[in-house]
């Protein structure tokens, strides 16, 4: 995700980078939950977890990034009580990370070695495109196209 955030021209503090990395590690925490409830259950698990070295805004960022990954980024009703605990900057980054994970997880099927082969590229007019190598083109289908 470091290369992706660079492609998006998003600057990060060391703490934000650490939280982004942690969110990537936690994003599949609710894998056993029913898909209709996975986002909410993951959000609740992370929001109420006892992490060391994570402040309240950081915990909310982690929870929201995972919720946005499962529920979509255009839903403003996700945990309104929690969104008030984070800055607009954290909320924006949670949405971006959640959106990125939402697309990439469909392409990787959570299998190791696939994600490093994908990359985001900035094109004319500021358009961002996900570049999929020819060897992985069969992973691209209707669901990733819709996201």
Spans of model-derived segments:
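Divalent metal-dependent catalytic cores for phosphoryl transfer on phosphate-bearing substrates
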Residues: 5-120
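Low-complexity, glycine/alanine/valine/leucine- and proline-rich hydrophobic stretches
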Residues: 110-147
């Amino acid at each position: 995700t470091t290369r992706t955030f660079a492609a998006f021209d998003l600057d990060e503090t060391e703490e934000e980078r650490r939280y982004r990395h942690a969110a990537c590690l936690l994003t599949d925490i609710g894998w056993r939950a029913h898909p209709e409830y996975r986002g909410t259950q993951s959000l609740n698990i992370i929001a109420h977890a006892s992490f060391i070295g994570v402040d309240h805004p950081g915990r909310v960022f982690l929870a929201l990034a995972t919720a946005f990954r499962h529920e979509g980024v255009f839903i403003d009703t996700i945990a309104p009580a929690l969104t008030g605990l984070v800055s607009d900057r954290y909320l924006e980054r949670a949405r971006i990370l959640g959106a990125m994970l939402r697309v990439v997880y469909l392409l990787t099927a959570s299998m190791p070695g696939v994600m490093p082969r994908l990359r985001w590229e900035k094109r004319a007019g500021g358009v961002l495109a996900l570049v999929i190598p020819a060897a992985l083109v069969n992973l691209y289908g209707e669901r990733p196209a819709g996201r």
